[in-house]
Amino acid sequence: MNPLIFSIITFTMMLGTGIVMTSSHWLTMWIGFEMNMLAIIPILMKKYNPRSMEASTKYFLTQATASMLLMLAVTINLVHSGQWSTTNPLNPAASIILTLAMAMKLGLSPFHFWVPEVTQGVHLPSGLILLTWQKLAPMSVLYQISPMINLDLMFTMSILSIAIGGWGGLNQTQLRKVMAYSSIAHMGWMTAILAYNPTMALLNLTIYIILTTTTFLTFMTNSTTTTLSLSHLWNKEPLITTIILVTMLSLGGLPPLSGFLPKWMIIQELTKNNSIIAPTTMAITALLNLFFYMRLIYSSALTLFPSMNNTVMKWQLNQTKSTALLSPLTILSTMILPLSPMLMLLE
């Protein structure tokens, strides 16, 4: 793709997200979603092949359906209130339809089927954008309407997402699908706390984006896409492999690492609001995520035959791509937990 055209498309995608996040008018918010959707399609098809074409088509159809539901919700609200402003209280029916539209855009269960297929069909940089940047606009809309969200609907979708995000990733050998199911589970955690403490949902989103970006950047340094290539990476780039494994443990929510912080704070907040069954169910189903990350670590690092590293290293190494962002992101992915006393100010 021509670099100038790619820059224009990327700018349009970012501008669309910015319009959604800053808009106080439902029509301009819908325009922002459309700009973002139409701009990301060429990014998903940057490396053109039948798989990326299929993935882009699935993504387009899903997002177009969600945009249609968004306009339906806005129209219902307009008929009842006569207002276009996002700050006005929503009609209950409009609130439910709008929540379903944003759930479809985020990939929450039961609208999660497109996420693994689309992520698997595109190359790693596009997958990174899909699982990080594309979550910002729908989450900002849910943040704005959080006082009017139907609590039962949101909790049902959240717990389903956490469970399906864990079950779906159990037998995966493709790392992009693993990250997709991890994304579904993390979205479930974010939306579970949205009605009680929206700021905490944004904290969870920030930590999720840091962890996912770190993981994808380490995959991109050596074009690692399968469990097999991850196990081969150990002899070629032991440091990068260690970063991948530690970041995966953090994504799973292992206590000493950064990924444990949002889960801990969300469970604490839910129990303060006299909700006991939901956080218990969420904590138990989150173990499924940790299990499939542990399975990846076991198959890639702990099943190697004992040998000196220098005896099995390749004599001819490919040039690895370096990135300046990887070092600070790795630190953030593993060491945010000591900052948690300051984050208690969010409560």
Swiss-Prot record:
Disulfide pattern: none
TM stretches of this protein: 1-21, 25-45, 59-79, 96-116, 122-142, 148-168, 200-220, 240-260, 274-294, 325-345
Subcellular location: Mitochondrion inner membrane
Organism: Thoopterus nigrescens (Swift fruit bat)
Family that this chain belongs to: Belongs to the complex I subunit 2 family.
Function of the molecule: Core subunit of the mitochondrial membrane respiratory chain NADH dehydrogenase (Complex I) which catalyzes electron transfer from NADH through the respiratory chain, using ubiquinone as an electron acceptor. Essential for the catalytic activity and assembly of complex I.
Entry keywords, A to Z: Electron transport, Membrane, Mitochondrion, Mitochondrion inner membrane, NAD, Respiratory chain, Translocase, Transmembrane, Transmembrane helix, Transport, Ubiquinone
Subunit description: Core subunit of respiratory chain NADH dehydrogenase (Complex I) which is composed of 45 different subunits. Interacts with TMEM242.
GO terms of molecular function: NADH dehydrogenase (ubiquinone) activity
Coiled coil segments of this chain: none
GO biological process: mitochondrial electron transport, NADH to ubiquinone; mitochondrial respiratory chain complex I assembly
Reactions that this protein is recorded to catalyse: a ubiquinone + NADH + 5 H(+)(in) = a ubiquinol + NAD(+) + 4 H(+)(out)
Domain of life from the UniProt record: Eukaryota
UniProt-listed PANTHER family: NADH-UBIQUINONE OXIDOREDUCTASE CHAIN 2
Protein name, UniProt field: NADH-ubiquinone oxidoreductase chain 2
Lineage: Eukaryota, Metazoa, Chordata, Craniata, Vertebrata
Principal EC category: translocase
Gene: MT-ND2
GO cellular component: mitochondrial inner membrane
EC numbers, comma separated: 7.1.1.2
Membrane topology according to the record: Multi-pass membrane protein
